[in-house]
């Protein structure tokens, strides 16, 4: 299949692009390199397009599937308005491209929509939005739901993803990454008070596998992507 990965120089996007290529697909990556890094794509043989999908993005190729990972993901990004508008506009542009080419569209949402909500977290539970990033993803999900009967569109609410190619996320990298970095440097790991806060941590290769499987779902949907296992920070270290 011919596949486009947006945000493909980022953390999940690069792992996804490399795995899709390993499986024999013809893959193109688009990234504006705002937070992604081409070093994440070492070994990638497909086309790289330097562009911002939130702007007037055009591509001449026809793709069978689009994996939309591009977004401002750092909840501490200083401009909430820009975070919301770029994320929502980029998604709408990918919807337009998918409609034009009759492509399957699989996009990154977030389990951050549940905030401090009840566990186990279910897709239909009340949302607890804590950031502009969360608001943008909720708007994307609402837009997707209106298209369920019109196109193949799948939203993936990732929980706490960790693994290779994460370091360029810097402060927005996972707690697993930061704890491992501190331990490797000989420092005592810094955790939240008492370290009893629980999170669902999923390895990036498992998240990529789940993302690829979304190409073959029978019905458009929005689903959680995690392990279903809550681990506290004390257990991590």
Locations of regions flagged by a protein language model:
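Ser/Thr-centric signal marking residues that sit
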Residues: 6, 110, 136, 198, ...
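Short, hydrophobic secondary-structure boundary micro-motifs
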Residues: 107, 190-193, 223-224
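Residue-level preference for the first positions of well-ordered beta-strands
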Residues: 2, 188, 220-222
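Structured beta->alpha junctions
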Residues: 9, 33, 195-196, 229
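NAD(P)-dependent short-chain dehydrogenase/reductase
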Residues: 132, 142-199, 204-215, 230
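Mid/C-terminal beta-alpha module of Rossmann-like enzyme folds, strongest
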Residues: 216-237
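N-terminal Rossmann-like NAD(P)+-binding domain of SDR-like oxidoreductases, especially those catalyzing
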Residues: 1-159
């Amino acid at each position: 299949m011919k596949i486009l990965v947006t945000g493909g120089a980022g953390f999940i996007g690069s792992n996804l692009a490399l795995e899709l290529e390993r499986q024999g697909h013809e893959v193109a990556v688009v990234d504006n390199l705002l937070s992604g890094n081409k070093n994440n794509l070492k070994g990638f043989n497909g086309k790289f397009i330097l562009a911002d999908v939130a702007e007037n993005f055009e591509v001449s190729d026809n793709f069978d599937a689009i994996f939309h990972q591009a977004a401002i993901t750092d909840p501490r990004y200083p401009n909430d308005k820009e975070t919301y508008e770029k994320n929502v506009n980029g998604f709408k542009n990918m919807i337009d491209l998918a409609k034009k080419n009759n492509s399957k569209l699989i996009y990154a949402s977030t389990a951050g929509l549940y905030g401090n909500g009840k566990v186990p977290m279910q897709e239909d539970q009340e949302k607890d939005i804590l950031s502009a990033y969360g608001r943008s993803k909720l708007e994307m999900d609402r837009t997707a739901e209106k298209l369920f009967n019109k196109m193949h569109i799948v939203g993936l609410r990732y929980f706490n993803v960790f693994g290779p190619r994460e370091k360029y996320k810097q402060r927005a990298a996972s707690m697993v990454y930061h704890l491992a970095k501190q331990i490797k440097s000989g420092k005592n790991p810094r955790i939240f008070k008492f370290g009893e806060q629980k999170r669902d941590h999923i390895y990036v290769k498992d998240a990529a596998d789940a993302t690829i499987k979304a190409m073959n779902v029978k019905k458009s949907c929005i689903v959680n992507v995690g392990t279903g296992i809550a681990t506290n920070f004390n257990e991590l270290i």
